[in-house]
């Protein structure tokens, strides 16, 4: 339980606000493994559980620790969802800066743009495939939004 509560919560704030490279994530996971298994002066300790088993939920016999790459992806998807809500000053800024006269479905990353924008564009395909809009008052974009559940018509 200590492993889950301490190790899983430490990088959460970093992953929510930035996009560290894969090398940083693997280094952090190596540090977690060293903390878990440790090492004695005479050599390494016995590994009571495999690292892959730690990532499994409790009900599947694991420790419930989440892989950092999965946490990063979930925060990226959350960023994209927040962006798609269109209800914040942050949305207005990001849309004006990166999507001027372009629909969200046509978002792309160009060199010298924000790392956060790159992170969002990288996950937008996955996010859009799970977003479905319900037309109640005619506010859904007929051509660009996934309102039928088969994806946007512009991608057909």
Residue locations for each model-derived region?
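A helix-boundary/hinge signal
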Residues: 1-156
């Amino acid at each position: 339980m200590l492993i889950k509560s301490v190790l899983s919560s430490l990088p959460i704030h970093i992953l929510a606000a930035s996009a560290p490279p894969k090398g940083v994530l693997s280094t952090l996971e190596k540090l977690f493994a060293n903390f878990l298994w440790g090492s004695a002066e005479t050599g390494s300790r016995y590994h009571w559980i495999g690292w892959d088993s730690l990532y499994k939920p409790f009900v599947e016999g694991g420790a419930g620790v989440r892989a950092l790459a999965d946490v990063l992806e979930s925060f990226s998807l959350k960023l994209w969802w927040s962006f798609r809500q269109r209800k914040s000053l942050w949305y207005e800024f990001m849309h004006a800066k990166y999507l001027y006269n372009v629909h969200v479905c046509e978002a792309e990353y160009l060199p010298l743009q924000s790392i956060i924008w790159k992170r969002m564009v990288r996950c937008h395909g996955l996010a859009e495939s799970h977003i479905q809009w319900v037309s109640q008052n005619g506010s859904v974009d007929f051509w660009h939004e996934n309102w039928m559940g088969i994806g946007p018509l512009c991608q057909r």
